[in-house]
């Protein structure tokens, strides 16, 4: 067999031409110990705090503690797959998540990876998970309502676009329901919603997603889920991820956004676990010293941007779970002091059938009537005061003393307001319907209706008005005020008489 030298030389020449010196220089370290989502790594002398690092099996972590001889790394993924002796290399990047309209209608984990089995998310952009909050010059005062569709809240504890309103109460008092009703009520308003579930049961998240889908709310919502089965680092990072996803719509698309953090108590517990495993010194209730900053840097990212920056907004509804109504515990007081008001839900009100179980006495909105349309200001101004007086009188009336007619009338009016404010779950009311009902009860057009029939009458009233006087609702919707109170009064009197004749 003859060797063709010219062929061999041509192949060799081609190989020499194509030869590239590919020398990658990575700064690497070695895993000393791993457990509970925390790795101690030797080496990585130049790693920066908060920098992402990559383990040899492709799992990512973040450098948290920089010590003399080692680096404390939190692992974002399955830490059981990492072994002692694995190499770890720097990436020179910070943690970023995919953002953009591709995420709408999807369920993702805090790293932006899909959990709903609908295939990959081909997002074109990413955003850092930790972004600086907008400064004073970038903001404008909150003045546009964020309607929740819940009568008790829209009338007495109004929420504005760009506000941070805490929902606080014991477990099982309907905190999540209020937040989800608010998301459902944004249908058709162009508001983008992000629901962040932290440390919840996977079954609960699944039923929440199903409910949003059935109500047609999933198409404008992103669900970020870090269930109780996920490692603590993922639960800790979840709210920041959700916030970054919403910030894209606020800054880039100039839209109004709503983010629900459900709930921040579990995030604080996850952060406490991480901090103790990293051997950071514990403080009150064993939380680390920077647990206030944990929540303040998250909630300060909510804002109503100035017109120069596109006038987008990010409204935050953080949820905190209390133990036995203890609002003065460490985390609740921290978050109360950061937010612009709180909606306090009481278990005894919930148990007695007053749902939503909002305690109007200690719930406040520090934005106040700036976040209400004029029609709501016209009718709801007196209601909070009347309800507070009713609660005082109610305690007094239980003593069984004889009451003068004026006090009795006030008690009856209060009872009617309480009945009118009751509302079934996931059935938010448009603001014009709320205005009509509240006008009817506060101006005395329900005084002849027996208290047990007030809710039934409320349904009857709205049905009649939609059928026969839809122009009344249309006028309130367009003008945002009640222009003809006399006419509305006549309509309500006629409907009340018709109801009393029939029932």
Curated annotation (Swiss-Prot):
A Pfam family per the record: ATP-synt_ab
Site positions (Required for activity): 363
Keyword set, alphabetical order: ATP synthesis, ATP-binding, Cell inner membrane, Cell membrane, CF(1), Hydrogen ion transport, Ion transport, Membrane, Nucleotide-binding, Translocase, Transport
CDD domains to which the protein is assigned, alphabetical: ATP-synt_F1_alpha_C (cd18113), ATP-synt_F1_alpha_N (cd18116), F1-ATPase_alpha_CD (cd01132)
Localization of this protein: Cell inner membrane
Recorded GO MF terms: ADP binding; ATP binding; proton-transporting ATP synthase activity, rotational mechanism
Domain of life: Bacteria
Catalytic activity: ATP + H2O + 4 H(+)(in) = ADP + phosphate + 5 H(+)(out)
Chief location of this protein within or outside the cell: membrane
Record membrane topology: Peripheral membrane protein
Database matches in InterPro entries: ATP_synth_asu-like_sf, ATP_synth_asu_C, ATP_synth_asu_C_sf, ATP_synth_F1_a_nt-bd_dom, ATP_synth_F1_asu, ATPase_a/bsu_AS, ATPase_F1/V1/A1_a/bsu_N, ATPase_F1/V1/A1_a/bsu_N_sf
GO CC terms, sorted: plasma membrane; proton-transporting ATP synthase complex
E.C. no: 7.1.2.2
PROSITE patterns (alphabetical): ATPASE_ALPHA_BETA
Residues involved in ATP binding: 169-176
Function field: Produces ATP from ADP in the presence of a proton gradient across the membrane. The alpha chain is a regulatory subunit.
Quaternary organization: F-type ATPases have 2 components, CF(1) - the catalytic core - and CF(0) - the membrane proton channel. CF(1) has five subunits: alpha(3), beta(3), gamma(1), delta(1), epsilon(1). CF(0) has three main subunits: a(1), b(2) and c(9-12). The alpha and beta chains form an alternating ring which encloses part of the gamma chain. CF(1) is attached to CF(0) by a central stalk formed by the gamma and epsilon chains, while a peripheral stalk is formed by the delta and b chains.
HAMAP family: ATP_synth_alpha_bact
PANTHER family given in the database record: ATP SYNTHASE SUBUNIT ALPHA, MITOCHONDRIAL
Record-stated family: Belongs to the ATPase alpha/beta chains family.
Protein name, UniProt field: ATP synthase subunit alpha
Name of the encoding gene: atpA
